[in-house]
UniProtKB/Swiss-Prot annotation:
One GO MF term attached to the UniProt entry: pyridoxal kinase activity
Ranges for region Substrate: 44-45
Record keywords, A-Z: ATP-binding, Kinase, Magnesium, Nucleotide-binding, Transferase
Gene source species: Salmonella typhi
Gene: pdxY
Protein name: Putative pyridoxal kinase PdxY
Length: 228
Protein backbone atom coordinates (compact mmCIF):
# COMPACT_ATOMS: atom_id res chain seq x y z
CA UNK A 1 0.00 0.00 0.00
CA UNK A 2 1.35 3.41 -1.01
CA UNK A 3 1.55 6.20 1.57
CA UNK A 4 0.60 9.69 0.37
CA UNK A 5 1.24 12.80 2.44
CA UNK A 6 -1.62 15.07 1.32
CA UNK A 7 -1.04 18.73 2.17
CA UNK A 8 -4.08 20.75 1.16
CA UNK A 9 -7.27 22.39 2.38
CA UNK A 10 -10.06 21.00 4.54
CA UNK A 11 -13.68 22.08 4.89
CA UNK A 12 -16.11 21.04 7.62
CA UNK A 13 -19.27 21.41 5.51
CA UNK A 14 -19.09 19.77 2.10
CA UNK A 15 -16.04 18.26 0.50
CA UNK A 16 -12.91 19.96 -0.88
CA UNK A 17 -9.20 19.36 -0.63
CA UNK A 18 -8.41 16.63 1.86
CA UNK A 19 -12.05 16.22 2.85
CA UNK A 20 -12.77 15.33 -0.80
CA UNK A 21 -9.60 13.38 -1.57
CA UNK A 22 -9.04 11.14 1.42
CA UNK A 23 -11.95 8.74 0.86
CA UNK A 24 -11.42 8.05 -2.88
CA UNK A 25 -7.66 7.70 -2.44
CA UNK A 26 -8.22 5.12 0.28
CA UNK A 27 -10.70 3.32 -1.97
CA UNK A 28 -7.99 3.24 -4.65
CA UNK A 29 -5.68 1.47 -2.22
CA UNK A 30 -3.56 4.34 -0.90
CA UNK A 31 -2.88 5.14 2.73
CA UNK A 32 -3.44 8.87 3.14
CA UNK A 33 -1.66 11.09 5.66
CA UNK A 34 -3.83 14.25 5.57
CA UNK A 35 -2.18 17.52 6.61
CA UNK A 36 -4.44 20.55 6.28
CA UNK A 37 -3.26 23.95 5.06
CA UNK A 38 -6.52 25.62 6.08
CA UNK A 39 -9.54 24.68 8.17
CA UNK A 40 -12.61 26.42 6.71
CA UNK A 41 -16.28 26.11 7.51
CA UNK A 42 -17.12 25.56 3.83
CA UNK A 43 -15.75 26.04 0.31
CA UNK A 44 -14.98 29.62 -0.70
CA UNK A 45 -17.34 29.43 -3.71
CA UNK A 46 -20.17 30.16 -1.26
CA UNK A 47 -18.81 33.70 -1.03
CA UNK A 48 -18.41 33.69 2.75
CA UNK A 49 -16.76 31.34 5.20
CA UNK A 50 -15.03 31.18 8.57
CA UNK A 51 -11.91 29.39 9.68
CA UNK A 52 -8.18 29.79 9.73
CA UNK A 53 -5.01 29.41 7.71
CA UNK A 54 -2.55 27.11 9.44
CA UNK A 55 0.78 28.71 10.42
CA UNK A 56 3.50 27.57 7.97
CA UNK A 57 5.57 26.21 10.85
CA UNK A 58 2.67 23.93 11.81
CA UNK A 59 3.16 21.95 8.59
CA UNK A 60 6.86 21.49 9.22
CA UNK A 61 6.35 20.53 12.87
CA UNK A 62 3.80 17.84 12.02
CA UNK A 63 6.05 16.27 9.39
CA UNK A 64 9.01 16.40 11.77
CA UNK A 65 6.91 14.43 14.23
CA UNK A 66 6.41 11.74 11.58
CA UNK A 67 10.15 11.75 10.92
CA UNK A 68 10.89 11.40 14.63
CA UNK A 69 9.05 8.07 14.78
CA UNK A 70 10.92 6.78 11.73
CA UNK A 71 8.00 6.74 9.30
CA UNK A 72 9.02 9.36 6.73
CA UNK A 73 11.03 6.80 4.76
CA UNK A 74 7.73 5.02 4.08
CA UNK A 75 6.17 8.07 2.40
CA UNK A 76 5.80 7.37 -1.33
CA UNK A 77 4.43 10.72 -2.49
CA UNK A 78 3.74 14.26 -1.36
CA UNK A 79 0.64 15.98 -2.71
CA UNK A 80 0.22 19.72 -2.34
CA UNK A 81 -3.00 21.55 -3.15
CA UNK A 82 -4.65 24.75 -1.95
CA UNK A 83 -2.28 27.05 -0.06
CA UNK A 84 -3.47 29.58 2.47
CA UNK A 85 -0.31 31.65 2.03
CA UNK A 86 2.85 31.77 -0.05
CA UNK A 87 4.85 31.11 3.11
CA UNK A 88 3.14 27.74 3.43
CA UNK A 89 4.53 26.90 0.00
CA UNK A 90 8.09 27.49 1.14
CA UNK A 91 7.59 25.10 4.04
CA UNK A 92 5.98 22.50 1.77
CA UNK A 93 9.00 22.47 -0.52
CA UNK A 94 11.15 21.94 2.56
CA UNK A 95 8.91 18.99 3.43
CA UNK A 96 9.30 17.61 -0.10
CA UNK A 97 13.08 17.77 0.25
CA UNK A 98 12.87 16.08 3.65
CA UNK A 99 10.68 13.26 2.31
CA UNK A 100 12.90 12.70 -0.72
CA UNK A 101 15.97 12.57 1.52
CA UNK A 102 14.28 9.81 3.52
CA UNK A 103 12.90 8.05 0.42
CA UNK A 104 14.64 9.00 -2.86
CA UNK A 105 11.90 7.20 -4.82
CA UNK A 106 9.16 9.48 -3.47
CA UNK A 107 7.33 11.74 -5.93
CA UNK A 108 5.99 15.27 -5.57
CA UNK A 109 2.54 15.83 -7.11
CA UNK A 110 1.68 19.54 -7.25
CA UNK A 111 -1.91 20.65 -7.75
CA UNK A 112 -1.16 24.37 -8.29
CA UNK A 113 -4.48 25.74 -7.11
CA UNK A 114 -4.60 29.34 -8.28
CA UNK A 115 -7.84 30.03 -10.06
CA UNK A 116 -10.83 29.05 -12.15
CA UNK A 117 -11.25 29.37 -15.94
CA UNK A 118 -14.27 31.63 -15.42
CA UNK A 119 -13.11 33.52 -12.31
CA UNK A 120 -9.40 34.19 -12.82
CA UNK A 121 -6.75 34.01 -10.11
CA UNK A 122 -8.43 33.69 -6.70
CA UNK A 123 -5.69 32.84 -4.20
CA UNK A 124 -3.74 34.76 -1.55
CA UNK A 125 -1.05 37.23 -2.65
CA UNK A 126 2.20 35.56 -3.62
CA UNK A 127 0.76 32.07 -4.12
CA UNK A 128 0.68 32.28 -7.92
CA UNK A 129 4.25 33.58 -8.00
CA UNK A 130 5.33 30.75 -5.68
CA UNK A 131 3.92 28.14 -8.03
CA UNK A 132 5.55 29.70 -11.10
CA UNK A 133 8.99 30.23 -9.59
CA UNK A 134 9.40 27.40 -7.12
CA UNK A 135 6.73 24.67 -7.15
CA UNK A 136 6.85 24.08 -10.91
CA UNK A 137 10.56 23.19 -11.14
CA UNK A 138 10.38 21.14 -7.93
CA UNK A 139 7.44 18.96 -8.99
CA UNK A 140 7.53 15.52 -10.59
CA UNK A 141 3.90 15.80 -11.68
CA UNK A 142 1.90 19.02 -11.91
CA UNK A 143 -1.86 19.26 -12.51
CA UNK A 144 -3.05 22.72 -13.60
CA UNK A 145 -6.46 23.61 -14.95
CA UNK A 146 -6.64 25.87 -18.00
CA UNK A 147 -6.04 29.21 -16.29
CA UNK A 148 -3.28 27.70 -14.14
CA UNK A 149 -1.64 26.31 -17.28
CA UNK A 150 -1.70 29.81 -18.78
CA UNK A 151 -0.25 31.35 -15.62
CA UNK A 152 2.53 28.76 -15.39
CA UNK A 153 3.44 28.86 -19.09
CA UNK A 154 2.84 32.61 -19.48
CA UNK A 155 0.97 31.91 -22.73
CA UNK A 156 -2.64 32.04 -23.84
CA UNK A 157 -4.04 28.56 -24.45
CA UNK A 158 -6.87 28.54 -26.98
CA UNK A 159 -7.01 24.94 -28.18
CA UNK A 160 -5.72 21.44 -27.48
CA UNK A 161 -2.55 21.93 -29.54
CA UNK A 162 -1.77 25.08 -27.54
CA UNK A 163 -2.31 23.11 -24.34
CA UNK A 164 0.09 20.36 -25.40
CA UNK A 165 2.73 22.94 -26.34
CA UNK A 166 2.29 24.81 -23.05
CA UNK A 167 2.51 21.55 -21.10
CA UNK A 168 5.74 20.65 -22.87
CA UNK A 169 7.16 24.04 -21.91
CA UNK A 170 6.40 23.21 -18.28
CA UNK A 171 8.05 19.80 -18.65
CA UNK A 172 11.20 21.53 -19.86
CA UNK A 173 11.33 23.30 -16.48
CA UNK A 174 11.11 20.23 -14.25
CA UNK A 175 8.06 17.95 -14.07
CA UNK A 176 7.94 14.65 -15.94
CA UNK A 177 4.17 14.73 -16.37
CA UNK A 178 1.64 17.54 -16.81
CA UNK A 179 -2.02 16.71 -16.20
CA UNK A 180 -4.32 19.45 -17.50
CA UNK A 181 -7.28 18.68 -15.29
CA UNK A 182 -9.83 20.83 -17.15
CA UNK A 183 -9.39 22.15 -20.70
CA UNK A 184 -12.57 24.27 -20.50
CA UNK A 185 -12.80 26.65 -23.51
CA UNK A 186 -9.59 25.21 -25.03
CA UNK A 187 -11.15 21.77 -25.48
CA UNK A 188 -12.69 20.28 -28.59
CA UNK A 189 -16.30 20.64 -27.41
CA UNK A 190 -18.13 22.96 -25.03
CA UNK A 191 -20.43 20.04 -24.19
CA UNK A 192 -17.62 17.82 -22.85
CA UNK A 193 -15.38 17.89 -19.77
CA UNK A 194 -11.93 17.32 -21.24
CA UNK A 195 -8.55 16.48 -19.71
CA UNK A 196 -5.05 16.13 -21.10
CA UNK A 197 -2.04 14.18 -19.83
CA UNK A 198 1.27 15.15 -21.42
CA UNK A 199 4.82 13.80 -21.22
CA UNK A 200 7.87 14.82 -23.22
CA UNK A 201 7.04 12.21 -25.87
CA UNK A 202 3.30 11.56 -25.72
CA UNK A 203 -0.07 13.14 -25.01
CA UNK A 204 -3.38 11.55 -24.01
CA UNK A 205 -6.80 13.23 -24.26
CA UNK A 206 -9.93 12.06 -22.47
CA UNK A 207 -13.41 13.52 -22.21
CA UNK A 208 -16.80 12.83 -20.67
CA UNK A 209 -20.20 14.51 -20.94
CA UNK A 210 -20.30 17.89 -19.21
CA UNK A 211 -22.94 17.74 -16.49
CA UNK A 212 -24.63 21.00 -15.49
CA UNK A 213 -24.57 21.25 -11.70
CA UNK A 214 -25.90 24.80 -11.65
CA UNK A 215 -24.21 27.67 -9.83
CA UNK A 216 -21.96 25.50 -7.63
CA UNK A 217 -19.79 23.08 -9.54
CA UNK A 218 -18.34 20.05 -7.71
CA UNK A 219 -14.81 20.61 -6.40
CA UNK A 220 -12.04 18.39 -5.10
CA UNK A 221 -12.12 15.57 -7.66
CA UNK A 222 -8.55 16.17 -8.82
CA UNK A 223 -7.28 16.06 -5.25
CA UNK A 224 -7.40 12.26 -5.40
CA UNK A 225 -5.40 11.82 -8.63
CA UNK A 226 -2.07 10.94 -6.95
CA UNK A 227 -3.55 7.62 -5.86
CA UNK A 228 -3.92 6.59 -9.51
Amino acid sequence: MKNILAIQSHVVFGHAGNSAAEFPMRRLGANVWPLNTVQFSNHTQYGKWTGCVMPPSHLTEIVQGIADIGQLAHCDAVLSGYLGSAEQGEHILGIVRQVKAANPQAKYFCDPVMGHPEKGCIVAPGVAEFHVRYALPASDIIAPNLIELEILSKHSVNNVNDAVQAARELIAQGPEIVLVKHLARAGYSSERFEMLLVTAQEAWHISRPLVDFGSRQPVGATASYPAT
